[in-house]
């Protein structure tokens, strides 16, 4: 089943306007890198953060009064994606699907830190609701007035593929007019420390090297409808898990094999880890391959949506960042590989089934 993208938005460390961030990516810009310090052990991490100004315009809603950064990112992206739709859907016929990986870590860490320091009696009833994975989806549904189906899908950097597949199933099997699919993540030293111990992070003493990933935060959102022209997701393949890093390229290769259909370029999930080599091996040396994570950072749960929006803009504008020779075939491949063994992918085609204006 093909799905039309009626609206899309992102909140990134490089900005929030889809067109503006896209221009900066094409120009070769990258989001600023900051150093985040862990007060517990003194460790330092390279991160890319979302400027506070990008969520300053949010409506004055009770749900946002004490909401963590992840919920504010999600609200900003979701509202913007809905606003982009030419014909706004009736909210009572819209489902919400939320993709997430680390969740509301800032408030979760504070909640359990108080318990560890002062005992269970110090647990904050205000912080506790923010510790569950579906808190951001709950906030967003309340802010938008969506009272129907609301789902939260938890996974790694490929979780966005699973969320999009769920949205496809919901639209195909119900009376829904549309599905708003949102993903968001926030940065906290606790998350960075976990990835540091797994040896995935870039060495803060060697920021210029391309080895290791730089954590980031933000959100992405797409409003999906039944096929009606415009940019369309043709096929979604959740993919298979891998249990060793050496298996990653084979699992990604099987995803590519199921999606091959006039693919002109690939928007991948390379982030400075083993994923870079696995993806290149899966798609081969000839296919143009670009990863927005190199410029925006590793946003984990939100990353697939940044990749999807990047692919849509590449199809629309006939430009691929970092490539002097634009591809000419009609489909973009979005390939996702997470650090916790998930893979997946999808194909996207442009408005007129021709990837780039003037191409044969």
Placement of each model-derived feature along the sequence:
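Catalytic nucleophile serine of serine hydrolases
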Residues: 157-159
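Conserved "HGTGT" condensation-loop signature of ketosynthase/thiolase-family condensing enzymes
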Residues: 1-149, 161, 169-172, 184, ...
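Alpha-to-beta junction loops
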Residues: 175-177
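Internal active-site segments that recognize and position negatively charged phosphoryl groups
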Residues: 166
């Amino acid at each position: 089943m093909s799905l039309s993208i009626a609206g899309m938005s992102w909140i990134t460390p490089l900005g929030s306007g889809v067109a503006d961030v896209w221009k900066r990516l094409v120009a070769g810009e990258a989001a600023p890198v900051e150093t985040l310090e862990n007060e517990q052990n003194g460790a330092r991490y390279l991160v890319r953060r979302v400027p506070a100004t990008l969520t300053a315009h949010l409506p004055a809603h009770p749900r946002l009064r004490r909401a963590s950064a992840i919920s504010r990112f999600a609200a900003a992206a979701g509202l913007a994606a809905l606003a982009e739709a030419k014909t706004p859907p009736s909210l009572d016929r819209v489902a919400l699907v939320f993709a997430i990986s680390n969740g509301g870590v800032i408030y979760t860490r504070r909640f359990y830190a108080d318990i560890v320091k002062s005992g269970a009696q110090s647990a904050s009833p205000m912080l506790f609701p923010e510790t569950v994975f579906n808190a951001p989806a709950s906030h967003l549904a309340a802010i938008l007035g969506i009272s129907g189906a609301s789902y939260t899908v938890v996974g790694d950097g490929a979780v966005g593929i699973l969320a999009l597949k769920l949205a496809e199933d919901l639209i195909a099997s119900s009376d829904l007019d549309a599905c708003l699919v949102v993903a968001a993540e926030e940065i906290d030293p606790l998350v960075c420390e976990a990835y540091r111990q797994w040896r995935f992070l870039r060495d803060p003493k060697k920021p210029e090297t391309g080895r290791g990933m730089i954590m980031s935060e933000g959100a992405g959102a797409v409003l999906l409808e039944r096929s009606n022209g415009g940019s369309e997701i043709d096929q979604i393949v959740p993919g298979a898990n891998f249990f060793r890093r050496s298996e990653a390229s084979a699992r990604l290769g099987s995803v590519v094999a199921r999606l091959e259909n006039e693919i002109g370029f690939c928007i991948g999930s390379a982030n400075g880890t083993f994923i870079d080599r696995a993806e290149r091996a899966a798609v081969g040396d000839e296919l143009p391959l670009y990863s927005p994570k190199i410029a925006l950072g590793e946003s984990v749960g939100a990353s697939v949506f940044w990749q999807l929006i990047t692919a849509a803009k590449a199809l629309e504008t006939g430009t691929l960042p970092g490539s002097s020779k634009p591809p000419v075939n009609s489909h973009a491949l979005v390939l996702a590989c997470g650090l916790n063994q998930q893979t997946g992918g999808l194909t996207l085609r442009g408005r007129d089934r021709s990837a780039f204006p003037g191409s044969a």
